Regions:
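FAD-binding beta-loop-beta segment adjacent to the flavin cofactor pocket
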Residues: 66-89
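Active-site micro-motifs of SAM-dependent methyltransferase domains
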Residues: 89-90, 135
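Short, histidine-centered active-site or binding-site loop motifs used for metal coordination
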Residues: 23-27, 87-88, 94
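A conserved FAD-binding loop/helix module that cradles the flavin
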Residues: 93-103
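Conserved FAD-binding catalytic core of PHBH/FMO-like flavoproteins
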Residues: 1-64, 73
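C-terminal helical "tail/cap" subdomain of flavin- and related membrane-associated enzymes
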Residues: 26, 49-56, 96, 111-190
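Structural motif of enzymes handling amino- and sulfur-group chemistry
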Residues: 19, 106-110
Length: 190
């Protein structure tokens, strides 16, 4: 991850020859506004380091502009209709929590259905929404906090020096030692 005054840039290795990159762009931009040359120029600029590392250009195989949005449906059930995964909640990709939440929903719903149909006990099934919403809101809070940390912007989408310093102080706390770092690690991995 690179926090830069021109916006966030991310470099995620997928293999020894393939990487996924992320660039923060102004709201309202379209894919057409980002030709390959502009993408590589901004990546080189935002990911620049003080050592001998350099970005290796290659073909851009896919381009998308992602609208960062989040929502939660409460409750996650209506009568006998139970919602799980993206049908119940959408998160920003920050922190990569969507699939974990969907699997947690599916597991809890499956356990509730098994108890309902095999043991004639509907307690867990009736508690499904309340049980899962606690985890959903924890993940939403983490995802949105991480999004703000990585993409925090000020007036007209440009980082404000004060906000930038606050973000950098927060990063120092979560990458160091102590309770905030442990809490962040638990939330990021868990």
């Amino acid at each position: 991850y690179a926090l830069h005054q021109d916006g966030f840039a991310g470099h995620m290795l997928r293999s020894s020859t393939v990487s996924r990159y992320y660039l923060q762009c102004p709201a309202g931009d379209q894919v057409e506004d980002w030709p390959d040359d502009r993408i590589w120029s901004q990546l080189r600029h935002r990911l620049a380091t003080d050592d001998d590392w350099s970005l290796q250009d290659g073909p851009v195989v896919e381009k998308n502009i992602l609208e960062m949005r989040s929502w939660v449906t409460e409750p996650m059930q209506f009568g006998k209709l139970y919602l799980a995964g993206d049908a119940a909640h959408i998160l920003t990709p920050a922190g990569a929590k969507g699939m974990n939440l969907a699997l947690g929903d599916a597991r809890e719903l499956a356990l509730g259905l098994v108890e309902h149909y095999h043991k004639a006990d509907s307690t867990r099934l009736k508690a499904y929404s309340a049980t899962r919403l606690a985890a959903v809101w924890r993940a939403q809070e983490f995802s949105n906090s991480l999004l703000d940390l990585l993409h925090g912007t000020g007036v007209e989408g440009l980082p404000v020096p004060f906000a930038d310093r606050l973000r950098r102080a927060a990063i120092e706390q979560i990458t160091g030692e102590g309770p905030r770092a442990r809490s962040f690690a638990d939330s990021y991995v868990g």
